[in-house]
UniProtKB/Swiss-Prot annotation:
InterPro entries: F-box-like_dom_sf, F-box/kelch-repeat_ARATH, F-box_dom, Kelch-typ_b-propeller
Ranges where the record places region Disordered: 1-25
Protein name (Swiss-Prot/TrEMBL): Probable F-box protein At2g29610
Domain of life: Eukaryota
Organism: Arabidopsis thaliana (Mouse-ear cress)
Segments traversing the membrane: none
Biased composition (Low complexity): 8-20
Family annotation (SUPFAM superfamilies): F-box domain (SSF81383), Kelch motif (SSF117281)
F-box domain ranges (all copies): 28-74
Length: 258
């Protein structure tokens, strides 16, 4: 079972209710006669989302967890990193959005021309609005998996809700094996597509009505069949939140290894 949990604080990660001085007074100091390397190995077993708990043990634990070396070196060398899906969700216009992460447990829009840099020739190339690439490519409902660009198209223009762009042929094709019968009723402008450990994840609102507060999560595994045809297999469909305020919009959804 998966659920969407809010991360305390503002979008920049600060916790306005956190007072380190009060924490020091509330927690008794503990003297640990352990090498720092051993402490790192012990704490590395804790998932990143639970790091606030070990921090409260003592100052030594806090220093280890807050160090860049711990998360970027120690956890990677010990193969304890894992993908975590984060989403930035806004609830009303002109209000500050909040960060959420997916945990396993019981302004007016303007059109802008997209420019891309070709590193071999060292040239800038403009992708016009009428180009085939721009047909389904949207920043929120698109993502890259295995060097291929995938997009969510709930209008099913190619008869399937997920499409993939083949750069060598400059053409979009449907992801076979996934159709609307496998998905909940989703609202396109409230749904996002993300790469989660090599799989596609759709995170989206249940419908387009203002009274809807549900967020669905659909996990889809990808595989190649019959040459280069991409197929999808729906692994799970679940409601990850029922408690969000109405009229929420998912502004960003990305996976981070922690």
């Amino acid at each position: 079972m998966v659920e969407l949990s809010e991360i305390p604080g503002d979008p920049n990660g600060a916790d306005p209710n956190n007072n380190p001085q009060e924490e020091d007074e509330e927690n008794l100091p503990i003297l640990l006669q352990l090498p720092e390397e051993l402490i790192e190995r012990i704490i590395a077993h804790f998932p990143q989302c639970y790091s606030p708990s070990p921090i409260l043990v003592c100052e030594t634990f806090r220093q280890v967890i807050n160090s860049d070396h711990f998360y970027y070196v120690t956890r990677s060398l010990l193969s304890f990193t894992k993908p975590v899906l984060y989403a930035l969700i806004a609830f009303q216009a002109y209000t500050r959005p909040s960060w959420f992460f997916l945990r396993q447990s019981n302004i007016a829009l303007q059109l802008h021309r997209i420019r891309s840099y070709e590193p071999v020739q060292g040239l800038w190339e403009s992708w016009g609005e009428e180009s085939e690439l721009m047909r389904f490519w949207h920043s929120v409902s698109s993502c890259v998996v295995g060097d291929l660009l995938y997009a969510l198209d709930l209008t099913c223009a190619l008869e399937h809700p997920i499409v993939v762009y083949y750069p060598n042929e400059f053409v979009w094709r449907p992801v076979m094996g996934v159709d609307t019968a496998h998905l909940p009723i989703l609202c396109e402008y409230r749904s996002t597509l993300a790469n989660f450990d090599g799989k596609l994840v759709i995170l989206g609102g249940g419908d387009c009505s203002e009274s809807s507060s549900e967020i669905w999560c659909v996990e889809i595994a990808l595989e190649t069949r019959q040459g280069d045809q991409i197929w999808g297999v729906v692994k799970s469909v679940s409601i990850v939140s029922r408690d969000l305020p109405m009229r929420h919009v998912i502004e960003l959804c990305r996976t981070v290894m922690v």
